[in-house]
Each structure stands twice: as C-alpha cells, then as structure tokens.
Curated annotation (Swiss-Prot):
It comes from the Eukaryota. Ca(2+) 2 binds at D91, D93, D95, K97, E102. In muscle, parvalbumin is thought to be involved in relaxation after contraction. It binds two calcium ions. It holds the Pfam family EF-hand_7. The modification N-acetylserine is found at S2. This is Parvalbumin alpha. Keywords: Acetylation, Calcium, Metal-binding, Muscle protein, Phosphoprotein, Repeat.
Length: 110
C-alpha cells in the first residue's frame, strides 16, 4: 500500500510544496491539506503504519524528521527545530516517541 492509495496525489503534492521552505512546516495545516483530517480512524492508522518505517509501533524522532518523505519521496527532511516541535505536539505521554493513538489524536486536533 502506498500513501496515494489513501490520499489524493495532487493534494499531497500541493501540501509538500506549501512547506518546502525550511522551518515552515505546520502539521495542522499539512494534515488538513493532504486530506488526512477527513479520513476515517482506520485510514489514519494505516498512514501511521506507513510512516513507522522500522515497524516498531512508534514513530521515533529520527523517523519524524522524514515524515514529509513518507508522503512524497522527493520532499525535504524536517529541520531539527520542526522535528522537535512536531514531537512535542504529538508525544502526549512524554516517552520520546509517537504511538498510533497519539498520532490519531495529533491528526484529529489539526
């Protein structure tokens, strides 16, 4: 399964392009622009599992830096600042990683 099986390729392209400048990433706007906010809880979980590259059941900080590439392979990496801000927004229990429920909450709050 690929991201375009769940989300519109044109929406992904526009969203990735909107945040092409370093330190411009806004997860709330991004999740809305790619159409993730409108998806079912099941589809949000499928996206989480695609972003969890090492299949640990969590998105760790190193994976989080590549989150845009999870949507589009030619997208940029997040800056260290953006990665830390996204982790702070998503890591509700403070364990240094984002679980599937935390990711679902992060998307729902956007």
């Amino acid at each position: 399964m690929s991201m375009t099986d769940l989300l519109n390729a044109e929406d992904i392209k526009k969203a990735v392009g909107a945040f092409s400048a370093t330190d411009s990433f806004d997860h709330k706007k991004f999740f809305q622009m790619v159409g993730l906010k409108k998806k079912s809880a099941d589809d949000v979980k499928k996206v989480f599992h695609m972003l969890d590259k090492d299949k640990s059941g969590f998105i760790e900080e190193d994976e989080l830096g590549f989150i845009l590439k999870g949507f589009s392979p030619d997208a940029r990496d997040l800056s260290a600042k953006e990665t830390k801000m996204l982790m702070a927004a998503g890591d509700k229990d403070g364990d240094g990683k984002i679980g599937v429920d935390e990711f679902s909450t992060l998307v729902a709050e956007s």
